[in-house]
Amino acid sequence: TATGYYTNNTPSGAMRTFGVLQPTFAIESLMDICSEKLGIDPIELRMINGMKDGAVTHTRQVLGKVAYTETLKKCSEIAGWEVGSSRVRGSVRKDIKGSQIAEPYIPGKEFKSEEAMKLCRDRFKYGRGVGTGWYGIGRCATIDKAGAFVEIDDGGTAMILTGVSEIGEGILTVLTQIAADELGMYPEDITIGDNDTARVPEAAHVGASRQTYMIGNAVCNACRDVKKKFIREMAAYWNIDSSSICMKNRRIYVEGNAQYNLSLKEAVDICKKIRGIVPLGSGTYTAHHDGLDPVDGRGNPWHWNLGSA
């Protein structure tokens, strides 16, 4: 049995990296309070204090590229946010400028009856606000790793095998796009196979926003491996230098030479039936960390980081 206690702590879990949402909510709330008291636009205050390239974290890690202010600036441009007093920001402003002009929202306008519109206006307030975040991705206590297999199949298509789990984050689409780009195919030519970890390489856990970075790189490396082998076999068949061969738009060819230009389907047939080779590739990706000092907490836990707005 278990006993649960109701407290004033925010419910938490592993959604968008462990332990980030809860303090971010508090920090962003305080940033708005500070901007109000100081009379500084909330976006301007965040631009002044936000993480920038070369920033040092609380663990003394020196960051490389940090996209926080860049992301916030782009978001403010799209939203048509004009710098000014935080007291006058909101959807009723007439002087909004930006790449996309936002029309003021009229509460209840979607309702047909006056009574429903009035009820909506009395209950809800509408305006605009800003929220930002920054965090590192992947495992920070241990080495993070992932692996993948790729096979170029009959018909000039490809099969990706990895232990990735799709729980709604869209990783299968991302891996399909990565593979298609690397192999010169279209997304519809890519199939993501069974993720039974007894038969496919480890992809590790779903969480900490790591899948695109870790598994995406593993798939990318696997595609480059099979592409190199595939081109090598076709170069031997054509008796030419492999460095001159390209794979793009479902074809394998030498630029400007019609003599060496085949569909991937035709090339796979040659590779299998004449060369006797099944085009297979494998790839791994590892993010190395030096861990954290158990005494003072210093270290470089993050291999990459994200900024959001």
Task: Describe the function of each predicted region.
Residues 1-5, 26-29, 36-38, 44-159, ...:
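Cofactor-centric catalytic regions
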